Swiss-Prot record:
Job of this protein: Catalyzes the attachment of proline to tRNA(Pro) in a two-step reaction: proline is first activated by ATP to form Pro-AMP and then transferred to the acceptor end of tRNA(Pro).
Principal cellular location given in the protein's record: cytoplasm
Record-listed E.C. numbers: 6.1.1.15
Principal EC category: ligase
Database matches in HAMAP family: Pro_tRNA_synth_type2
Family assignment from sequence similarity: Belongs to the class-II aminoacyl-tRNA synthetase family. ProS type 2 subfamily.
UniProt xrefs under PROSITE patterns: AA_TRNA_LIGASE_II (PS50862)
UniProt KW keywords: Aminoacyl-tRNA synthetase, ATP-binding, Cytoplasm, Ligase, Nucleotide-binding, Protein biosynthesis
Cellular component, GO annotation: cytosol
Gene name in the database record: proS
Protein name listed in UniProt: Proline--tRNA ligase
Location in the cell: Cytoplasm
Signal sequence segment: none
Organism domain of life: Bacteria
């Protein structure tokens, strides 16, 4: 993509309305634009990140055996009345009437609807297990939306729902999805800790929150130092991982640690995922019954698995930034490479830039080629801000010898590379 043809409305000044780093950087880098309190338009750069995260989440859900569906944003209120949850959400749930005076709502979650889908289509234990997921926009009318997309009113979520014949099988599915979440966050390039949690209004028997470690996190997490090995050793047994200590500050008790205090560390964390073993709460209330192996009707056992896709964008930035801007993990970066031509009127610079652009594009590496008239200092500031993992810098002096500079955005290290060999260094 040529920057001269791209829509990248960067801001030079810090927006006064932004309170946290991710909100400031998303506005400054032209990722989003606020349309109302807690409601944002996703501009091209931000949408690319959102799609990259969505694709990684979907890939890991598919690997775990979940099947993708797409439920509507708008839900009939009678399903929530049937499940007994209609009044639980209070004013956070946006309710309205259609022209026929039917009460509808903008779904804040989907347990009720997925239970309705299940009960009308699956009747026998022979059709189990089933695991369905969707990625859809949701709305919660937060009384005080803040922190940009971290706590907006409209947000993108991945929700999965599993159905099993009994508790034993339901826990097996839960463990499979627990491992899928570990893999998902590893693939996203972030360090996430699973913490035992309360089920809240969702209900149920077993629950874990996943917190990305970031200095600006809202919660303090105390956890076993062995969690740091997950990035390099993803095949650790789920039961072993679940046995490691991890607790949020309100549940951490130094007098009840199962291991020595020296084996524990603490960090700030941002919650980005929550999984629940619900049990039969919804299936009993909504009569989602199946014929078991003995020919008797039994309520299906359910679990729910959520990941905040749009919230993840902000959380990843909070964990990967510096005073200059964003530092994207390679897997989610909107562009893997910023190609910076310092003199677009120098024929050799143009030649090398064209070659680098073609070579990288031919390998399906996404490149943002800065072919603008901006001054070098302005170009460096822009590309440091938007956070491409690699920067290729082409100036007249080194270009004369077929040399370009390759800068690693995270470390700041710069290497001189022959343009012919450039492709071998991008990964």
């Amino acid at each position: 993509m040529l920057l001269s043809q791209y829509f990248l409305p960067v801001l030079k000044e810090e927006p006064s309305e932004a309170q946290v780093t991710s909100h400031k950087l998303m506005l400054r880098s032209g990722m989003i634009r606020q349309q109302a309190a807690g409601i944002y338009t996703w501009l091209p750069l931000g949408l690319k990140v959102l799609k990259n995260i969505e694709n990684i989440v979907s890939l890991n859900m598919n690997k775990a055996g979940a099947l993708e569906v797409l439920m509507p944003c708008i839900q009939p209120a009678h399903l929530w009345m049937e499940s007994g949850r209609f009044n639980n959400y209070g004013k956070e749930m946006l309710k309205f009437q259609d022209r026929h005076d039917n009460t509808l709502l903008f779904g804040p979650t989907n347990e009720d609807m997925i239970t309705d889908i299940f009960r009308h289509n699956i009747k026998s234990y022979k059709d189990l297990p089933k695991n369905l997921y969707h990625i859809q926009w949701k709305f919660r009318d937060e009384i005080r939306p803040r922190f940009g997309v971290m706590r907006g009113r409209e947000f993108l979520m991945k929700d999965a729902y599993s159905f099993d014949i009994n508790e034993e099988n339901a826990v097996k599915t839960y463990n499979q999805m627990y491992k899928a979440y570990i893999n998902t966050f590893r693939d996203l390039g972030v360090f996430a800790i699973p913490v035992i949690a309360d089920n809240g209004p969702i209900g149920g028997k077993l629950s874990h929150e996943f917190h990305i470690i970031a200095e600006t996190g809202e919660s303090t997490i105390y956890y076993d130092k062995r969690f740091k090995t997950l990035k390099d050793n993803p095949d650790i047994d789920v039961d072993e991982i679940k046995s490691w200590y991890a607790a949020a500050e309100e549940k951490h008790d130094i007098n009840k640690l199962p291991i020595s205090e020296q084996e524990i560390t603490s960090s700030k964390g941002i919650e980005v995922g929550h999984i629940f073993y619900i049990g039969s709460k919804y299936s009993v209330n909504m009569k989602a019954l199946i014929n078991d192996e003995h020919g008797k009707l039994a309520p299906v056992e359910m679990s729910s698995y959520g990941i905040g896709i749009s919230r993840l964008v902000a959380a990843i930035i909070e964990a990967n930034c510096d005073e200059k801007g964003i530092i994207w993990p390679f897997s989610v970066a909107p562009f893997k490479v910023s190609l910076i031509n310092l003199n677009i009127h120098d024929s050799k610079c143009v030649e090398l830039a064209a070659k680098a652009y073609k070579d990288l594009s031919d390998k399906n590496i996404e490149v943002l080629y800065d072919d603008t008239e901006a001054r070098p200092g302005s170009k460096f500031a822009t590309h440091d801000l938007i956070g491409s993992p690699h920067q290729i810098i082409i100036g007249p002096k080194k270009a004369a010898n077929n040399i370009v500079e390759l800068k690693d955005r995270k470390s700041g290290n710069i290497e001189d590379i022959e343009v012919e060999n450039l492709i071998n260094y991008i990964k």
